[in-house]
């Protein structure tokens, strides 16, 4: 079993919780049973752990340091961390990423998983591996561009 920590911006906001719900559902439905050997190894039994779903209801009941320490404790027992879109603007996500890097926990960005899944599906459907890889790379570039644009819009809103 591969334990995968899901790092997603939260800040106690309902819209972030709703987005995290969608991400976790996609990961569990599509990636939990989808046998992608990379980036998580050959084990097809992925367990996705979301601190928002475990501790989110306590966001306004404990101080920030206590909450982030719980998150890091959870992360410390994981094999990998998935960084969800918007992590760049989140203090908590950045702390989790730094911890993961310092402790040799595999880091992957959600858009990389989406591209990997599309490549695998294309190859399984009979597409040439090289063509599927090019299509996956193009998809990854498009997803990253959209994530960057979303981040810029979010930053512009917070300035205004």
Where are these regions (language model features)?
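Conserved catalytic or regulatory cores that recognize and/or transform ribose-phosphate-containing ligands
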Residues: 1-160
């Amino acid at each position: 079993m591969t334990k995968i920590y899901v790092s997603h911006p939260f800040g106690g906001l309902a819209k972030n919780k709703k987005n995290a719900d969608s991400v976790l559902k996609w990961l569990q439905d599509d990636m939990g049973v989808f046998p992608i050997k990379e980036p998580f190894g050959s084990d097809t039994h992925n367990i996705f752990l979301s601190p928002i779903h475990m501790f989110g209801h306590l966001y306004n009941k404990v101080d920030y340091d206590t909450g982030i320490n719980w998150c890091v404790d959870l992360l410390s027992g994981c094999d990998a961390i998935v960084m969800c879109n918007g992590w760049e603007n989140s203090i908590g996500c950045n702390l989790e990423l730094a911890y993961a890097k310092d402790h040799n926990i595999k880091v992957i960005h959600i858009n990389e998983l989406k591209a990997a899944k599309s490549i695998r599906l294309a190859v399984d459907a009979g597409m040439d591996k090289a063509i599927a890889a090019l299509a996956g790379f193009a998809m990854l570039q498009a997803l990253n561009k959209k994530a960057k644009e979303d981040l810029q819009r979010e930053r512009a809103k917070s300035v205004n």
